[in-house]
């Protein structure tokens, strides 16, 4: 009988839900030299039928849900199928050898299993001609792990996983399941507590607030962006004008946000009209809380189901690529939420979270920080990044809150943190993780860009890892953004006393490769919209907006503008409502919109703006000392070419100068390319007079121009 095959302790562990190796005695067991026995565990069942080589037989019920059937010697997994209570007829999950191999374990525990997304989670696959889903999870502290779903009536006793040696990895292949199956993990902790968890490696989830994981076939979509992917370039010497978008609040139809597919069509067309080269999406990784804007992630491998399916998001990226628009994602490897259904205390103990601090919760966000010393956690995060680049064809990752990762004392008071081994406040493990991340991303996907949201003077953020840097392609220049906003808020009458806010960033502008952001963080939480930050009446506000956006275009560095800024939304951003698109019916907003399209087109067309823009040689001051008139002027050069340049002039006062003289030697020709005060942009129409070359004894020493109030003028000059 079956008791001769299964010892009483194993039976007890199985029935009580604490069995870590069910494959040891379930499935096909060799009973003698002449016969095998199929042993099944179906708790609560009184009858189990088995289809064996075309014939249906009834299994013998022994006790406590254990059934068996004697079969011919040499029975194989594909020889029989089990009739399940839910009507499914499928092969036996416990008849298969382990699919997680020694090399998987080695790479995973080294933190270098870079295609971990093809091995962890719920993977639809074919095992010896039998279709099903391989379930794999890392839970080293658990006594038992089961997968539960409709297919087993959410009963954790039915489908316990096998613990693969001492790796802490558990697996089970369940034949007959397919894409769309909803599931969760049921874990028994070391203390005996039963936890229900979503899949850390889940590629799909139910629509929030539901949090059930969903089996996804990540390779089912047929891509059409081969030309884009083949021609995709690293943009260090290319134009990069990014439109930052929150998917749920860009545009609504019938009282709801656009889905991925409709959004793709409208957003691609919109970006083409305004000459944006890329969109950057606030995190669309799955998250339970709308108010987090996606920055408190529970599904690092899944696009949120709020706006459509996994394949719908792939269509979104595909369509934008086919229309010539790149896609960048905000990615959050710095912290994760405390929700009990997700990563927090995943197997009953701190697994993904760091325990280095006295208070494990980050004081700014009340979230957990990741344990960067743990190779498996590092593999989880880097695997997430590579997943989006591989399976979703993403063109860039903007890493959120890098500063909080770099410093142990970020947001913490004395006594709330412990120094590193050298006595400093640098988080050496996080630094190593960042270098590892950038090295792997740039090796596997050389054309992909990485961006750091980093607000301190931490050195070499955009230096290569081989040169001792962190390896990012670009760093957000938050100092430039804050200085600019501080200056623009001041009444023009008093700006002479704040001139340094305009010029200071140029002292360090070439220490890193910078991106100049006008981001979402500055138009929310009571900070007001861009328009609300600016003093003056309506005409003055819009003149300032044209000046602000053209000033950004002319400054060294790549560009980013958050949605709504391009047409000057009055209200500050709300993630719960659409942008106020009706404003484009107003001439002020429509004229600014037209101005932005012209500026972006000019930016993309002229290499003076972007070729070598991270090098000192691309920039030369003409005059940064005119504090009295609130004017700055400078040249922008295209690489090392000095035969021509753009002359950029920004006038931040409300005065009009019919003849403003700039001392700039050697100019032979001077052509006006852009005037933010042009009537077609809503301006006064001043500044369009031909410049007058100032010559002394046949030596050109300057130009005299008509300088409008609150305006940018851009001239193309030759020497």
Curated annotation (Swiss-Prot):
Reported function: Catalyzes the formation of the alpha-1,6-glucosidic linkages in glycogen by scission of a 1,4-alpha-linked oligosaccharide from growing alpha-1,4-glucan chains and the subsequent attachment of the oligosaccharide to the alpha-1,6 position.
Alphabetical keyword list: Carbohydrate metabolism, Glycogen biosynthesis, Glycogen metabolism, Glycosyltransferase, Transferase
SUPFAM superfamilies, alphabetized: (Trans)glycosidases, E set domains, Glycosyl hydrolase domain
Pathways per UniProt: Glycan biosynthesis; glycogen biosynthesis
Residues of the active site: 400, 453
The keyword Magnesium is assigned to this record: no
Pfam families: Alpha-amylase (PF00128), Alpha-amylase_C (PF02806), CBM_48 (PF02922), GlgB_N (PF22019)
UniProt family annotation: Belongs to the glycosyl hydrolase 13 family. GlgB subfamily.
Quaternary assembly: Monomer.
Reactions this protein catalyses: Transfers a segment of a (1->4)-alpha-D-glucan chain to a primary hydroxy group in a similar glucan chain
GO annotations of cellular component type: cytosol
GO molecular function terms attached to this record: 1,4-alpha-glucan branching enzyme activity; cation binding; hydrolase activity, hydrolyzing O-glycosyl compounds
EC number(s) stated in the UniProt entry for this protein: 2.4.1.18
CDD domains per UniProt: AmyAc_Glg_BE (cd11322), E_set_GBE_prok_N (cd02855)
Organism: Chlamydia caviae (strain ATCC VR-813 / DSM 19441 / 03DC25 / GPIC) (Chlamydophila caviae)
Protein name: 1,4-alpha-glucan branching enzyme GlgB
Disulfide links within the chain: none
Keyword Glycosyltransferase: yes
Example GO biological process: glycogen biosynthetic process
Listed PANTHER family: 1,4-ALPHA-GLUCAN-BRANCHING ENZYME
